[in-house]
Amino acid sequence: MSTVVDFVIGQINRTRDLNRQPFDHATSVATPHGRWGIVHYGIMVPNLPDPFRFFDAIVILGTARAPIFGKRSLAAGDPGDSAWILTGSAVTPNGFEQYSIADQCDMSDDGAHLRFGDQLAIDRTISGITLSASRPQASVQLTLNPTSAVSHFAHIPGVYDHWSVLCQAEGTFTAGDNSLTRKTLCTYEYARAVNLPLPFLFFTYQILNVDEKTQVLMTEVLGPAGLPVHRGAYIRDVDGAATTHTRGYEHTVHEYCPDQLTTPDGHKMRMPKRFGWRVAGDDGAELITIDGTSNDDFAYGLGTGYAGSYHYTGRFRDAPIAGTGYIEWIDRR
């Protein structure tokens, strides 16, 4: 059954050929225009030391009609004029803000320059990407150098595109009087979509830096009745290798947090406490197996859900691994 589902998904979501190609650094990252009513930018950094544990900058321009990515009742004004911003970490749990694109944001049409009040600025040039984020509890300065390793999650021509490029990054993370400088791996992401009321009800996206050169992504999207829309793992490294894996995919929540979280629109969301996932290689043998325990540091503002971190142990390519993973979680079932 799993093979049949993955085949059907592949006929709709045409990413197979794209995921065999290196990243084209001239790829458009334009702001909303024409049919593309929703645009998303993201920078995610897993496996940071305490007190940060993780950092993300999530930008959604426009108010999505898909229930996991937008809630039009929360828009302060015109839903199409709303910019939804999260600068999240374990020390910035209240990093979510909403802005008027026309009155409070400064953006170039090509997406090379993005500024949202005094909270977040992202600039992209031929030489790299810079980020500056500021909240009352913390500030972050990052320089990203994109590699040629890219993972395409979605390519439905004329409807939806979503990709993530592996980046080498160096930055300073400051909380109060404490400051740390870190060289690490992170992601730079872009998505654009026609604003359709797609009935997606569950979404998780997880990022692990398993060593200094290798990053693993896991993602799962479910529709009504638990119908899988997208699921699998992506492995990429700084030398440009990037592979996609769906064979033997499993994802299980063993225990939920005792207290549900209440979103700004009043939805009570179950959050994972203990969970695991795995995927096999093309030969059917174990490729990666993960056991995770949430750090209970979820920050609201990832679409209509949360982002946070978890401690994990497991195996990758027959070797033991452990670290702090990044997790996005939206459950509107």
Stretch-by-stretch model annotation:
Residues 1-333:
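Structured soluble/peripheral alpha/beta segments that form catalytic or ligand/cofactor-binding pockets
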